Amino acid sequence: MINLSQKNVVQVANLTGFIKDNVEKVMRLADILEFICSTQWKDKLVLKGGTAINLFYRQLPRLSVDIDLDYIGQSKEEMGEDKERLWEFLQTSLYQKNYSLSPKRKRYFALDSAVFQYVNNAGNRDNIKIEINYLDRNHILPIKEMPLATPVVQSDITINVLDVCELYGSKLAALLGRCKPRDIYDVYGLEKDNIVSDMDMLRKCAIFYNCIAGEANINEVSSDILDGVTERDINRQLKPVLKKSEKFNRSEVISELKEYLKELFALTEKEKLFVEKFNAKQYCPELLFEDEQILSRIAHHPMALWRMR
């Protein structure tokens, strides 16, 4: 169980150099994840996004602000049965942990998004957003089961997490689609620390997630999109989750990332054809991947098939 006491939060904040209220938020994120993974829902959910990257693969260079999960039950029928049960489970369990469900919640066939409010140790109101995607339930690479061990929080309970290559592939797709400051920071960490060695697989994962997201055509997108992130965006959306001592040079980072993206996204002819056919409502994963196990896993990917409608 995560120690959420004010004394522990202050101590960890002082040791790590992060803002105290945001340290408490990360501890609460971890506490919720730990609780979920101590129940029958552990085998039905996998963690993804920036929280997965920073809690499990990068020793928390920045703090996380939400929980992004994929449901991984296989059949549509199983998903339909589990969706309402999981929603009720989250509401009931977090209410018992003194969280209240915000009216900002959104419920769709493909996604449940809930904002849970709480009062922190300093007496300030804050919230944690939890999103569960039900159409990304098939994955390119095998899911990892990993322990939580960071400078801010540790747990003996293991958590299902996407493979690092797939995580960063989806993060790259997010960068090209929405280009938020935290996406820039996470991808810069990928490039700077050489976290993924298989660049071909990384590119293919990014292409796949870009296509199923439907946000921007990777054959046409320009790295100039990074220029749209301003110093004001960095100050408001990124710096509060960094260590107080960390410096972030926007122009230098964007310049390096542009070169990295240019090299990474030199698509092969087959990769270009996959994108063209996907945009023409033809799903041909064999143009992107050759591995039979990967093709078997994503042959009936619900989101990819939904995009074909």
Where in the sequence are the language-model features?
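Structured mid-to-C-terminal alpha-helical surface segments
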Residues: 1-45, 55-67, 71-309
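Glycine-rich beta-strand-to-loop/alpha-helix junction loops that act as flexible
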Residues: 47-51
